[in-house]
Curated annotation (Swiss-Prot):
The keyword Membrane does not apply. It comes from the Bacteria. GO terms for molecular function: lipid-A-disaccharide synthase activity; phospholipid binding. InterPro entries: Glyco_trans_19 (IPR003835). This is Lipid-A-disaccharide synthase. Belongs to the LpxB family. Pathway: Bacterial outer membrane biogenesis; LPS lipid A biosynthesis. Keywords: Glycosyltransferase, Lipid A biosynthesis, Lipid biosynthesis, Lipid metabolism, Transferase. GO terms for biological process: lipid A biosynthetic process. GO terms for cellular component: membrane. It comes from Haemophilus influenzae (strain ATCC 51907 / DSM 11121 / KW20 / Rd). Signal peptide: none annotated. It catalyses: a lipid X + a UDP-2-N,3-O-bis[(3R)-3-hydroxyacyl]-alpha-D-glucosamine = a lipid A disaccharide + UDP + H(+).
Length: 390
């Protein structure tokens, strides 16, 4: 490797990966001002000077049906990436998330003497744990957001570095509620529940009804309670409004385009689907209840495949049931309302418990707030310069 101008390959497959890639490139440029960046980039990575082989959107497909439909094109892109990398011989290849695409590329490149890093651990600790052997063969190192992920890799002696979570860096330890209310143009003197029905069509389909009925029950118990409903895009908004018109036509809601983070900061509590949103709610210091429903067959399979005691990231991080998880048959309006009312009550013990929970959230936030972009860049530098022991 040329010490001052390495060629660094990065491949991102969706918006979250583009954000991570751009942050990583920025930090690497500070160390290697003359480095060349190539791969598959989104607009943010392109703005940082990364050359792209194809538009990142080409990789952004979700769901089995969509993947099968686009499979010939995806395989062609993967073949093109492998051929290009074998010709260019970058000093390191960094696959950013997108494991179904990147791990096969990494496997081929590592076998041909190219250093590889996988940035963002697949949920191998939760299900399909045998993937760990492929990851070990494909990568020189995995960069993990969460400490329990590194602990899992350590059990299998697979090189992994915990770098902290970029979201924990982006959200302050003490979020500003007044500012969030101002951004949303809502009255800070009011009491609010944030309702996040998920970003996927299937999540909205399964969760909108129980979540809306929960809101009705809570409105009876707390007549002054108002509801903030951030929706990720126009498609999900139309889908949600259609369900609402049938289920709770007279319920007043503040529908918000995006801005989920501000809604959670402004709210007294949050009702949400599992996933990254639960981690974000924790970082926003919003007491939450996690609700999730899926097709019976999907649930039957998931119960047998998933190897963890909890499904939400706050509970996985704490290794205890910090926030209620109401899954499948437990995800009923009555049970959700019962759990949420504890957070919304003015009762002295409820207020005390709320403070204790928020302190737990703050402690967990501090554990994963490590300047992840910088840590990721340092891991790349250490691998390039032969100091990769962790």
């Amino acid at each position: 490797m040329n010490k001052t101008n390495p060629t660094i390959a990065l491949v991102a497959g969706e918006v979250s990966g583009d954000i991570l890639g751009a942050g990583l490139i920025r930090q690497l440029k500070a160390h290697y001002p003359n480095a060349r960046f190539i791969g598959i980039a989104g607009p943010r990575m392109l703005a940082e000077g990364c050359e792209t082989l194809v538009d990142m959107e080409e990789l952004s497909v979700m769901g089995l049906a969509e993947i099968l439909k686009h499979l010939p094109r995806l395989l062609k892109i993967r073949k093109n990436v492998i051929q290009t990398m074998l010709q260019e011989k970058p000093d390191v290849y960094i696959g950013i998330d997108a494991p179904d695409f990147n791990l096969d590329v990494e496997l081929k490149l590592k076998a041909n003497g190219i250093k590889t890093i996988h940035y963002v651990s697949p949920s191998v600790w939760a299900w399909r744990q045998n993937r760990i052997h492929k990851i070990a063969k494909a990568t020189h190192q995995v960069l993990a957001f969460l400490p329990f992920e590194k602990a899992f890799y350590d059990k299998f002696n697979v090189p992994c570095r915990f770098i902290g979570h970029t979201m924990a860096d982006a959200i302050p330890l003490k979020p500003n509620r007044a500012e969030a209310c101002q951004t949303l143009q809502i009255d800070p003197a009011q009491r609010y529940l944030a309702i996040l029905v998920g970003s996927r069509g299937s999540e909205v389909e399964f969760l909108a009804e129980p979540f809306l009925k929960t809101a009705l029950l809570l409105k009876e118990q707390f007549p002054d309670l108002q509801f903030l409903v951030p929706l990720v895009n126009e498609k999900r908004r139309i889908q949600f409004e259609t369900i609402k018109a049938k289920i709770t036509p007279n319920l007043d809601l503040h529908l918000i385009d995006g801005n989920a983070r501000q809604a959670m900061i402004a709210a007294d509590a949050t009702l949400l689907a599992s996933g990254t949103a639960a981690l974000e709610a924790m970082l926003c210091k919003s007491p939450m209840v996690v609700g999730y429903r899926m097709k019976p067959l999907t649930y039957f399979l998931a119960k047998r495949l998933v190897k963890t005691d909890y499904i939400s990231l706050p509970n996985l991080l704490a290794n205890e049931m910090l926030v209620p998880e109401m899954i499948q048959e437990e995800c009923t309006p009555e049970l959700l309302a019962e759990k949420l009312s504890v957070y919304l009550s003015d009762d002295e013990s409820a207020v005390k418990n709320r403070h204790v929970l928020i302190q737990h959230f703050t402690d967990l936030h501090q554990k994963i707030q490590c300047n992840a972009d910088k840590q990721a860049a340092q891991a790349v530098i250490d691998l390039l310069e032969g100091k990769e022991n962790v």
